[in-house]
Amino acid sequence: MGTILFASDLDNTLLFSHRHRQPEDRCVERLNGAEQGFFTRETPDLLPQVVQRVHLLPITTRSIEQYQRIQWPDGTAPRIALTANGAVLLRDGQVDRAWYAASQALVRDHREALAA
């Protein structure tokens, strides 16, 4: 794995919804049995090459649950990911409590404005 950090959005970048599905796309996400998310035909072949060269950091608006539904090709699941607009850092699929506490502290004084 390389020393370069490759930060990437997921939806409509690396992963596409069923609404944008192409005939050769590969399903990598299901919800209640229904196909939800897809990689392009090339993505499963290219991801191993990417993760050998760089640290892949997905950054997404997805919730933890939505992110964890993604079935990454063998050996390509990112060790870290930012979910919930960066509020939650996952390390090997587990919430980084220190990151979460720091995120909450940043918005503490602005909750009223954010809720409006």
Per-segment meaning from a language model:
Residues 1-2, 86:
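Generic structural motif recognizing short loop/turn segments at the entrances and edges of beta-strands
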Residues 39-116:
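Active-site phosphate-binding/coordination module
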